[in-house]
Regions:
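Catalytic core of the metallo-beta-lactamase
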Residues: 15-70, 107-196, 280-288
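Short beta->alpha linker loops
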Residues: 3-4, 53, 77, 199
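Generic structural signal for helix capping and beta-alpha/helix-loop junctions
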Residues: 8, 79, 105-106, 204
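A short glycine-rich beta-strand->turn/loop micro-motif centered on a GG-aromatic cluster
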Residues: 1-7, 100
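Active-site metal-binding motif and surrounding structural segment of the metallo-beta-lactamase
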Residues: 55-97
Length: 289
C-alpha cells in the first residue's frame, strides 16, 4: 500500500446510501478505524455528521457533490478518534452542534443540540432525537430523517448497543440505554435504516459497501434488544461493558473537549488501534466498534 499505515489511517471511502430529487445521503467510511461519518444533502445545502479529523475529505466531497456545508454535528463526544467537527465548521463558516451535556465544562464554540427539535437542510428536516439517546455517553444524540433513516451515532450499531461504561457509570448509563431502546426508539418502524457511527466487521457492509441495517433486523438478531426486563437488561449490558476501554481514550476525549492540543504525529499515534465502543452480545457476530 503506497504511503503505508499513515496513508491507510487517512483513507476515507464515500458511498451513496440514498439519493432522490430531494435528498442525498453519503456514508463516509474510514476503513482503518471503522469510523463512519455522513453527509446529508438537499437543495445545495449540507450537514456533516461525526466528521473525522481529516477535514479536507468533507471539503472535497462538498465540491464534488456541489453543496454548501451549513451544519456540522457531533452525535456525542468521541472517545476513540479525534473529531474534525469544530475545525470543519470554523473553516467553512458553518454552525457546529453538540449536546450541552457533552460540552459541559468545555470552552468549545458550539450550538447546543438540545435546543433543536429539527435542523433544516435544504428541503429536508433532520429530526434531532435529542431525546437524547444516552447510555453510551450521557449526551449521545441520534438523528432521524423522514422516519426512514436513523443516524444512530454510537447508540445502536448493526451488531450491538453502545457501551455505557466510558464515563465510569456503567449501571446508571445501562439504565438510560434501557430507556432509550424500549421507550425513546420503540415507535420507530422496523423498516427504518440504522446508520451507525462505527462498525467492526466487514460483514456489516451490504453489497454496495454501505454499513447499515433495518431496525427490525437488528431487533430480531440482537437478543439484548428483546430483553424487556429492566433489571436483567441493565445487568447484562453493564456486565458486557466491563472490558478494555479504547486505547488513549482519556487523551482523545480531552482533545475533543478542546482542553488539549497535539501535533499531527501525536494525533495519529493516539488513534492507532481498534475501536471498543460497543457491547458484546449474543445472537449475532461480535461487535467492537
Amino acid at each position: 500500500l503506497a504511503g503505508g499505515m499513515l496513508a491507510w489511517s487517512r483513507f476515507y471511502h464515500p458511498v451513496i446510501v440514498y439519493a432522490d430529487e430531494k435528498l442525498k445521503m453519503i456514508q463516509i467510511n474510514r476503513l482503518a478505524k471503522g469510523c463512519l461519518s455522513y453527509a446529508v444533502i438537499s437543495e445545495g445545502k449540507g450537514m456533516i455528521i461525526d466528521p473525522g479529523k481529516e477535514i479536507e475529505v468533507y471539503l472535497e466531497l462538498a465540491g464534488e457533490h456541489r453543496f454548501e456545508i451549513e451544519h456540522v454535528v457531533d452525535s456525542h463526544l468521541h472517545a476513540d478518534h479525534i473529531t474534525g467537527g469544530p475545525r470543519l465548521a470554523e473553516q467553512v463558516g458553518a454552525t457546529y452542534y453538540l449536546s450541552s451535556e457533552e460540552a459541559k465544562g468545555t470552552h468549545l464554540k458550539y450550538e447546543p443540540l438540545d435546543r433543536h427539535d429539527r435542523i433544516k437542510v435544504g428541503d429536508v428536516q433532520v429530526e434531532v432525537l435529542s431525546i437524547p439517546t444516552p447510555g453510551h455517553t450521557p449526551g449521545s444524540t441520534s438523528f432521524l430523517i423522514d422516519n426512514r433513516f436513523l443516524l444512530s451515532g454510537d447508540t445502536i450499531f448493526v451488531g450491538g448497543l453502545g457501551r455505557p461504561d466510558l464515563g465510569g457509570k456503567a449501571k446508571e448509563w445501562a439504565e438510560d440505554l434501557y430507556h432509550t431502546v424500549f421507550f425513546k426508539l420503540k415507535d420507530l418502524p422496523d423498516d427504518c435504516l440504522v446508520l451507525p457511527a462505527h462498525y467492526s466487521d466487514i460483514r456489516e457492509m451490504n453489497d454496495r459497501g454501505v454499513v447499515g441495517e433495518l431496525l427490525g433486523k437488528i431487533r430480531e438478531n440482537n437478543e439484548i434488544m428483546r430483553n424487556e426486563d429492566k433489571a436483567s437488561f441493565t445487568e447484562q449490558v453493564a456486565g458486557a461493558a466491563s472490558m478494555e476501554k479504547p486505547p488513549n481514550f482519556e487523551e482523545i476525549v480531552a482533545i475533543n473537549r478542546g482542553e488539549l492540543q497535539v501535533d499531527e504525529e501525536r494525533a495519529i499515534e493516539l488513534e492507532i488501534g481498534p475501536n471498543r465502543c460497543a457491547v458484546h452480545h449474543h445472537g449475532s457476530h461480535e461487535e467492537e466498534a
